[in-house]
Design a protein with these regions (language model features):
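Fe(II)/2-oxoglutarate oxygenase catalytic core
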Residues: 2-234, 238-273
Length: 273
């Protein structure tokens, strides 16, 4: 007999939220296939607070992962990246093995409306390596001096997809971004997609942009996730950067499924004075 048919309300315990680092990340112990609206609300609250959430020991099908993502909003389709056969909104991720250099970034900031949330599920893991690092961009902003914050408040930057051989895909975004749900301010430039400041040349932009994109991932802002079988990790592209660590043995597979939630156009709301 179902819970509804029996007329009995079963009290489910609140999900346990365990912080993972000083300024970013928490683990939430819950089965994502069996969450009601109340539990989802608590997950969303933890997500907005901690910026990335790790869900251990999941057994999600593509439909399960899509259903969870849709609780947050419409889905985002990556340009020029084919999805999984039969589930075109699920993007298979297979990075090269061996030791290679990655790039710190927020996803697809060359888009006028970059994705808001990424949800990555581990499907097959190497014997070692293949971590993902995350950096809190609220913390990156808050650690800047008052003078630097004042300078950046009126600035915009040009983002393009030239690192993906598509230089013609570009847009401009504010250098500081107001999160649409929390109202907090985040630094919003990254070394993969941000090319220069608007109304400046690349040469003129170079020094300040290099400082900001390096400052963005100071170690104290970061959490490094060591993937385990069954892990699902979601992060907020509006307030975090991430870095795929490509350091696993040659020939060993790291296979992931990614589902992405669509976002809005970045904006900066100056604080009231």
């Amino acid at each position: 007999m179902s819970e509804a048919a029996s007329g009995v309300t079963i009290e489910r315990p609140d999900p346990v939220v365990t912080p993972l680092a000083g300024l970013i990340g928490a683990e939430v112990d819950v089965d994502l296939r069996e969450i009601d609206d109340d539990v989802f609300g608590r997950i969303r609250q933890a997500f907005l607070e901690y910026v990335i959430i790790v869900f251990p020991n999941q057994q999600l099908t593509p439909d399960d992962q899509l259903a969870f993502a849709r609780r947050f909003g419409d889905l985002y389709r990556y340009p020029h990246s084919p999805g999984m056969k039969g589930h075109d909104m699920v993007l298979p991720i297979k990075l090269p093995s061996g030791v290679r250099r990655g790039r710190w970034h927020s996803d697809a900031t060359f888009d006028e409306r970059p994705p808001a949330i990424s949800i990555l599920a581990a499907r097959e893991l190497p014997s070692r390596g293949g971590e993902t690092a995350f950096a809190n961009q609220y913390a990156a902003f808050e650690a800047l001096s008052d003078g630097m914050k004042e300078l950046l408040a009126g600035m915009e930057a040009v983002h393009d997809a030239s690192s993906h051989n598509r230089r013609e895909e570009w847009t401009t975004h504010p250098v500081l971004r107001t999160h649409p749900d929390t109202g907090r301010t985040a630094l919003f430039v990254n070394s993969e997609f941000t090319r220069r400041f608007a109304d400046m040349t690349t040469e003129e932009s170079e020094g300040l942009l290099e400082f900001l994109t390096t400052h963005a991932h100071r170690p104290e802002f970061c959490y490094v996730h060591r993937w385990r079988p069954g892990d699902v990790v979601m992060w907020d592209n509006r307030a975090a950067q991430h870095y795929p660590v490509m350091n696993r043995p040659e020939g060993e597979i790291r296979r992931m499924w990614r589902v992405t939630v669509a976002g809005d156009r970045p904006r900066y709301d100056a604080p009231d004075t």
